[in-house]
Amino acid sequence: MTPCLFLVLTLIPTLACLPDSPQNPQDGTLGSGAASAAAAAVDQQFIADILSRIARTGAEVGVAFRTLDGKMEWFSRADDVFHAASTMKIPVMIELFHQAREGKVKLDDPLIIKNEFHSLVDGSIYTLDGADDSEADLYKAIGQTRTLSQLCELMITVSSNFATNLLIEKLGVDNIRATVTSLHADGMNMRRGVEDNKAYEKGMNNTTTARGLLILLEAIAKGRAVDPDSSRQMVEILTRQKFNDAIPAGLPPGTRIAHKTGDITKIHHDAAIVYAPRPFVLVILVRGMAELKDSAALMADIARRIYQSAKQNTSSGPVATSKAIE
């Protein structure tokens, strides 16, 4: 049987079969408090529009969306594993604030800037090339110091790989992994620093799922990632993100958004807390599109549709689900 997407509403037993899609989101769920057939129709179109838009690209796309009130959600290929690209910098930031709370470090502690890092494969030394990084000024500071908070700012807002690796070596990969586990973000698998070519050649990469990133961002948004004050500071850092051509481009001008992007060859992600009238977390992972402008446009379109659906659906009833079934 052709896979169909069925919307099952808790209050009104409405079933709707949507067109098939190459996405075939076996775990696809849409939840909302909608308590009417009219609301169900809106939700059906919401799903159909997004899946149709994705199908036209031929890309593999993972989406995880949930309002912070927990009353509306949608997942499509949310447990598919993707190369994490620079979204892996989110757990590094969380671990920095975790160790600061534990008294192991202070955010204003100075760290000597040195371009020497250890490969996951054999512990051998490798270096980064400023020409391949999104931020070059830090390479001019080798031998000087920067505070941990300054490095965190560079890591998140301009996605500095150099700052990221300095923080990873300071904090420890195992500690970062343990904190991710404590937050139950099972889809995020943090293994190594950036540009570890020996590890990359052996397929030893940082990976994530859309659901895993959503769990981390929800923890930050709800003040649970470390503690409320640390979470607030992390949100503020994420709002200063300089790369805003994906999810933010699909939102109304002036919408506050705290997010982290990431991209490598044919990989482009955006993971966001969106402070809309009905706040939500949205994670979009894209694999297989050669041009960043095209994947950015796709993510903006998805964000636009989700923003409108969340805005229109203001009901507060029980959660509904939809699943692709054979």
What are these regions (language model features)?
Residues 33-40, 76-83, 135-142, 150-154, ...:
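Second-shell loop/turn segments in exported
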Residues 51-52, 56-82, 105:
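Short, conserved catalytic-motif segment at the N-terminal edge
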Residues 4-16:
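Bacterial N-terminal signal peptides
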